[in-house]
Amino acid sequence: MNPTIYLSCLVVFSVFLLGKVHAENEDEFVTEKQRLLSVYGDSSVDEATKYRNVDNLVTFYDKYSTLLPLTPDLSKRAEDLLRRYKEENARAVLVDGAPAQGGFWMPLVKLLIVQLGVEIASEGVKRAIGS
């Protein structure tokens, strides 16, 4: 096969794969964003559900923070809280693979992240209504 044709086919195939991966990531972003908005943006959702989804919120923010239109102040607060959350998770002592009971800081950091999630969700709803 002619090297030029081979290289052209390889480039077209690579662009196709990159486009497909980008579309899948965008679909995943939209799906997860809607799910987290339904958890943190709905006042009828109980606090236990919000606490159970803190890890998902942290993962989502880590992965897609550049796609979220947050104010600089809200973005800085989110970065600070997530840094603290990760530090506390790193310090957590595991007993038989599960975190030990007790501790003061982790529940406090989780509370702050839940409040931040609610604030980000309400900000997103306001922007959606405003546009």
UniProtKB/Swiss-Prot annotation:
Residues 1-23 form the signal peptide. Keywords: Immunity, Innate immunity, Secreted, Signal. Belongs to the Turandot family. It holds the Pfam family Turandot. One of its GO terms (cellular component) is extracellular space. Coiled coil: none annotated. It is found in: Secreted. It comes from the Eukaryota. This is Protein Turandot M.
